Amino acid sequence: MKKLKLRLTHLWYKLLMKLGLKSDEVYYIGGSEALPPPLSKDEEQVLLMKLPNGDQAARAILIERNLRLVVYIARKFENTGINIEDLISIGTIGLIKAVNTFNPEKKIKLATYASRCIENEILMYLRRNNKIRSEVSFDEPLNIDWDGNELLLSDVLGTDDDIITKDIEANVDKKLLKKALEQLNEREKQIMELRFGLVGEEEKTQKDVADMMGISQSYISRLEKRIIKRLRKEFNKMV
């Protein structure tokens, strides 16, 4: 089961990369003005109720008014050698994903869910940063966590068995990708599921898919390019 979960995560990630979506892309928060204050419980609740209806204004406010949370979490990783502005930018990607995928019906606060997504986005970036691995001692204290405990580099980088973090990563990106896939018709979805093994099966070649569907490989190739272009547009609307 564990190997299956990791394999499925890899397949989803592979498709995300095919769509041109990279988790380590950096988006900067410009300006020097003070960040807006957090929302009150009632204000947040009103905005959350509008999310399922696709209210983009509510989405934007929820993101903006939770930027202080991004800064707070980013400062936990200041001693990793990464510029604080970069950490905030990366964490903001996690915040956007959190707001896009948050389910108001679940018994969890947005701040709690967003904190996990923000921290996970930063952790994923740090894992891919070879400069940290080579220049900082693996057991060197980096900072103090929220509970007052020393935060070691080994805690930040984790291991391949860090299933909790992998699950958050998979759930956030897969949820966004599933929303994009829902915009496809049945044949288009079938092609993507077969090509990228999205339903637990092995990945199929274009020739395999063509044979299974009774059409030419060149036609499958053209369809796949068109579908990926469409998926990229749908995904970019949500991220």
Curated annotation (Swiss-Prot):
Among the GO biological process terms of this entry, one is:
DNA-templated transcription initiation
Specify whether Ribosomal protein is a keyword of the entry: no
Q: Which InterPro entries match?
A: Cro/C1-type_HTH (IPR001387), RNA_pol_sigma-70_dom (IPR014284), RNA_pol_sigma-E (IPR014200), RNA_pol_sigma70 (IPR000943), RNA_pol_sigma70_r2 (IPR007627), RNA_pol_sigma70_r4 (IPR007630), RNA_pol_sigma_r2 (IPR013325), RNA_pol_sigma_r3/r4-like (IPR013324)
Q: How is it modified after translation?
A: Proteolytically cleaved in the N-terminus by SpoIIGA to yield the active peptide.
Record's keyword terms, sorted: DNA-binding, Sigma factor, Sporulation, Transcription, Transcription regulation
Any GO molecular function? sigma factor activity
> Which function does this protein serve?
Sigma factors are initiation factors that promote the attachment of RNA polymerase to specific initiation sites and are then released. This sigma factor is responsible for the expression of sporulation specific genes.
Q: Which family does it belong to?
A: Belongs to the sigma-70 factor family.
Q: What is this protein called?
A: RNA polymerase sigma-E factor
Question: What species is this protein from?
Answer: Bacillus subtilis (strain 168)
Query: Taxonomically, what lineage is the organism?
Result: Bacteria, Bacillati, Bacillota, Bacilli, Bacillales
Q: Which gene encodes it?
A: sigE
